[in-house]
């Protein structure tokens, strides 16, 4: 049976239980191989084990029944005890209710008795108090103070209580009959008040907070209580401003007083508020005035910096003081204190800001032009000047000489950074110093100054000067520096746009000025882009003009119709080499001067014009067979140059031109087949015919029949 119990190990798994039983049975497991297996022995062991399990089950069942009977017995006993306890609890609760009713009855009697005693005692106490006051009043009436309360210095608290009450009584007495005694009481009242204030002062100097609290409590009912607070505030500030930073000193002072004032006065928030008011209206106001008045008229830059710094530090101090208990509306209280200090400076702040920003911006620009030994010229507008400009844009007529700027763009990133930095500081000051209702309007005024000096006086002037410096398209070896102007103008536009978004937008985002600023910015940028487009267009005209000069000077008629057809080296001509070198140089300059889609747009325009020039140039010559091969070599080199543009349309144009040049060399019998090829099939027959007409054998080979 013990063996059977051992087999019931936790956790119990039936399959493992059978395996362990088989394993323990000799001849039952796999030990010894198949020969050692004894099924009869295993069956016998299983039968015996089943009998053991049945016996064990019976024993366990009897034990379970015994335990169930025991549980039922204990449950009945427990239920009986619970019933007895419930009865006992009910009896106790009834006793408790009776006792509670009795206590309530007694309490009612006691309260009634207390009210009766108080009704008797209160008049008696008042009578005793009145008797004492009459006694003290008689002493003042007789002119001789004999009572210990007046003669003993240690009883100043009791004397103060008496004299305060006598003072109130004396005020109700007629003056004609009691003028003398009223005067004596008033004199004593004043003397005691002075003694108490002196005692408070001495206690404060000794650092005796408990004594200060006692005296302040007595003085609370005297007229001189406010004077006591003034004395406390004055003495608190003695030696408080020893550092160079008055704002930090003030913060430390208020923190120290805030910890102490509640232990002394019954109205600590009022005392602390009065201290803060004194600090602001006396100490800080005097300091701010000293700092600002000396530079207000003489140095606008220093004045604005100091005003911003002082206002910022004052508001920072105010934020620290917001942590203290100053009453119900401490935000309004502190705001009024700040306003009282700065109101005279803030009411005309924006005028000073605008005046300074204008003069500073003008100085930055003038300093730059002086460094270039350049005298700004006035840009003509309207009337004849506009007419000449329109004619100049649409034709190549030289309407007066162009201005030689010696490659100077008159754009300076340093100047731009300085102007933006000045404006950024102005925006920061505007944000801090402007009234919230005036902020969008003031920010817009600063923005207009930035537009005036950065966009108009600097960028627009440089663009106008750059436009005036672009030579006519028939000029030779022209210095096309306008692309440098484009590059610098793009960089400046990005900086201008960044400042607009980072510093102006937060100030106007929720006001009607937002749309006005966006519109002004849009107009400025459109105006600049129009001038940039004009300049780029004229620069491209100059580039094409320079290519024309190269081709006219370098290309000879004999290049494409050599005298000795058998002694010709098949390669591109010298004119082609020079044109391609020039084009590659200009393409690189365009890529360096612009970014994004602007590069593709300008390169496509240049590529289209380059293709048109090449096409028209090739139309000027007659081609022999070898000359046609040379023309194909030239166009192949032009096409290779066009690949640098990385514009699919331009490359397609030169591919088509290359295919057209094949018409110059193809055998007459194959001409029709080539014309119907993939690249030429979509072209107008007149274009194909015009190229075939350039062949030297056009008439002799009767090539016109292919187009009839």
UniProtKB/Swiss-Prot annotation:
Coiled-coil segments on the chain, per record: 40-101
Phosphothreonine PTM sites in chain numbering: 122, 395, 405
Acetylation listed as a keyword: yes
Modified residues (N-acetylalanine): 2
Tissue: Ubiquitous.
Chief location: cytoplasm
Keywords: Acetylation, Coiled coil, Cytoplasm, Exocytosis, Phosphoprotein, Protein transport, Transport
Gene Ontology CC entries for this record: exocyst; midbody
Cell location: Cytoplasm; Midbody
Pfam families named among the record's database cross-references: Sec10_HB (PF07393), Sec10_N (PF20667)
GO biological process: epithelial cell apoptotic process; establishment of planar polarity; exocytosis; Golgi to plasma membrane transport; negative regulation of apoptotic process; non-motile cilium assembly; protein localization to plasma membrane; protein transport
Residues modified as Phosphoserine: 412
UniProt keyword Phosphoprotein, yes or no: yes
MF terms (GO), sorted A to Z: small GTPase binding
InterPro entries on file: Sec10-like (IPR009976), Sec10_HB (IPR048627), Sec10_N (IPR048625)
Summary of subunit composition and partner proteins: The exocyst complex is composed of EXOC1, EXOC2, EXOC3, EXOC4, EXOC5, EXOC6, EXOC7 and EXOC8. Interacts with EXOC3L1.
Record-stated family: Belongs to the SEC10 family.
Stated role: Component of the exocyst complex involved in the docking of exocytic vesicles with fusion sites on the plasma membrane.
Full protein name: Exocyst complex component 5
Organism of origin: Rattus norvegicus (Rat)
């Amino acid at each position: 049976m013990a063996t059977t119990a051992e087999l019931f190990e936790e956790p119990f798994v039936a399959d493992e239980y059978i395996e362990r039983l088989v394993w323990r049975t000799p001849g039952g497991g796999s030990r010894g191989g198949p020969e050692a297996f004894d099924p009869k022995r295993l069956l016998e062991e299983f039968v015996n084990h089943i009998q053991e399990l049945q016996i064990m089950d019976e024993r366990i069942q009897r034990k379970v029944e015994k335990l169930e009977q025991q549980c039922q017995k204990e449950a009945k006993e427990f239920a009986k005890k619970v019933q007895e306890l419930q009865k006992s609890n009910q009896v106790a609760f009834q006793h408790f209710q009776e006792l509670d009713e009795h206590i309530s009855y007694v309490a009612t009697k006691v309260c009634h008795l207390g009210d009766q005693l108080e009704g008797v005692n209160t008049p008696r106490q008042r009578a005793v108090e009145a008797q004492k006051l009459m006694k003290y009043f008689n002493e003042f009436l007789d002119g001789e103070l004999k009572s210990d309360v007046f003669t003993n210095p240690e009883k100043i608290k009791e004397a103060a209580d008496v004299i305060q009450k006598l003072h109130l009584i004396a005020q109700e007495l007629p003056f004609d009959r009691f003028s003398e005694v009223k005067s004596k009481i008033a004199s004593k009242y004043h003397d005691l008040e002075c003694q108490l204030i002196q005692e408070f002062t001495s206690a404060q100097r000794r650092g005796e907070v408990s004594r200060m609290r006692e005296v302040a409590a007595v003085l609370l009912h005297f007229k001189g209580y406010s004077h006591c607070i003034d004395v406390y505030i004055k003495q608190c500030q003695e030696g408080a401003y020893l550092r160079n930073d008055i704002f930090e000193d003030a913060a430390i002072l208020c923190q120290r007083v805030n910890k102490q004032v509640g232990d002394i006065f019954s109205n600590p928030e009022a005392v602390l508020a009065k201290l803060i008011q004194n600090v602001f209206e006396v100490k800080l106001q005097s300091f701010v005035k000293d700092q600002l008045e000396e530079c207000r008229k003489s140095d606008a830059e220093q004045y604005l910096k100091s005003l911003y710094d002082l206002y910022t530090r004052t508001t920072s101090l105010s934020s620290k003081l917001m942590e203290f208990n100053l009453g119900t509306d401490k935000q309004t209280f502190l705001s009024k204190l700040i306003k009282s200090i700065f109101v005279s400076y803030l009411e005309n702040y924006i005028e000073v800001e605008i005046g300074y920003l204008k003069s500073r911006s003008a100085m930055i620009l003038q300093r730059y032009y002086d460094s270039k030994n350049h005298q700004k010229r006035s840009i003509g507008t309207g009337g004849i000047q506009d007419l000449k400009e329109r004619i100049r844009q649409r034709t190549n007529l030289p309407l007066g000489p162009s201005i030689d700027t010696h490659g100077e763009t008159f754009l300076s990133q340093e100047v731009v950074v300085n102007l933006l930095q000045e404006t950024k500081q102005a925006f920061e000051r505007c944000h801090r110093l402007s009234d919230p209702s005036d902020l969008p309007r003031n920010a817009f005024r600063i923005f207009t100054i930035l537009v005036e000096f950065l966009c108009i006086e600097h960028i627009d002037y440089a663009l106008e000067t750059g436009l005036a410096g672009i030579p006519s398209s028939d000029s030779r070896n022209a210095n096309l520096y306008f692309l440098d102007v484009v590059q610098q103008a793009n960089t400046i536009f990005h900086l201008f746009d960044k400042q607009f978004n980072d510093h102006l937008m937060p100030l106007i985002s929720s006001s009607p000025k937002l749309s006005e600023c966006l519109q002004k910015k849009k107009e400025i940028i459109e105006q600049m882009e129009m001038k940039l487009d004009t300049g780029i267009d004229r620069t491209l005209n100059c580039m094409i003009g320079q290519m024309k000069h190269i081709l006219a000077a370098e290309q000879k008629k004999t290049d494409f119709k050599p005298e000795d057809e058998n002694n010709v080296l098949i390669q591109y001509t010298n004119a082609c080499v020079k044109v391609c070198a020039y084009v590659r140089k200009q393409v690189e300059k365009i890529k360096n001067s612009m970014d994004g889609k602007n590069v593709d747009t300008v390169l496509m325009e240049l590529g289209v014009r380059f293709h048109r020039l090449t096409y028209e140039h090739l139309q000027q010559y007659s081609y022999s067979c070898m000359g046609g091969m040379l023309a194909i070599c030239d166009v192949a080199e032009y096409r290779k140059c066009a690949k640098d543009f990385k514009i699919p349309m331009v490359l397609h144009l030169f591919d088509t031109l290359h295919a057209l040049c094949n018409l110059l060399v193809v055998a007459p019998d194959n001409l029709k087949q080539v014309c119907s090829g993939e690249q030429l099939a979509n072209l107008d027959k007149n274009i194909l015919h015009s190229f075939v007409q350039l062949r030297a054998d056009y008439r002799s080979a009767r090539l016109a029949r292919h187009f009839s």
